[in-house]
């Protein structure tokens, strides 16, 4: 496994003990791969409180920041895709940056963004 980017669906799946999410996560860590979580995805999934399973998942991950350059790139991608979800666009751009597939629960929202980015990054649905 070369890498993987988690969408909010993957984080929520981990919190709900989805075996497929945990199996892929454990496989990545065993291969020495740190999964990437865009910071905006963390904001979408984090609700405070202990969230022990999500916290456990995050200890093995890299959290990708969202800065001015990312904001501009996201805006351009949203324009090109004629859509408006900032989180989904940042997920796609993060996957492109890391040349990694995405683990998500809603591939349908990501595909137009991948297409607008003229890319073919793999999207794995859980």
What residues fall within each predicted segment?
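Acidic, metal-associated active-site segment
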Residues: 85-101
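General small-molecule cofactor/ligand-binding pocket signal
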Residues: 36, 64, 122-124
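Short, well-structured N-terminal submotif of metal-dependent ribonuclease cores
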Residues: 1-37, 43-57
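Acidic, PIN/NYN-like endoribonuclease modules and their adjacent C-terminal/linker elements
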Residues: 96-126
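Short active-site oxyanion
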Residues: 31-35, 60-62, 96-101
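Short, hinge-like loop/turn segments at secondary-structure boundaries
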Residues: 51-56, 81-82, 119-122
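Acidic catalytic patch
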Residues: 43, 61-81, 93, 107
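Short beta-strand scaffold positions
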Residues: 37, 65, 86, 104-105
């Amino acid at each position: 496994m070369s890498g993987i980017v988690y969408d909010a669906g993957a984080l929520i799946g981990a919190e709900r003990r989805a075996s497929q999410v945990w199996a892929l996560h454990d496989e990545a860590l065993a291969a020495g791969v740190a999964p990437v979580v865009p910071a905006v995805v963390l904001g979408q999934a984090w609700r405070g409180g202990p969230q022990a399973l999500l916290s456990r998942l995050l200890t093995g991950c890299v959290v990708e920041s969202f800065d001015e350059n990312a904001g501009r790139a996201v805006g351009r991608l949203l324009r090109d895709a004629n859509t408006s979800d900032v989180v989904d666009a940042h997920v796609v751009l993060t996957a492109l940056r890391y040349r990694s597939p995405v683990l998500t629960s809603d591939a349908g929202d990501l595909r137009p963004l991948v297409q607008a980015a003229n890319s073919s990054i793999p999207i794995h649905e859980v």
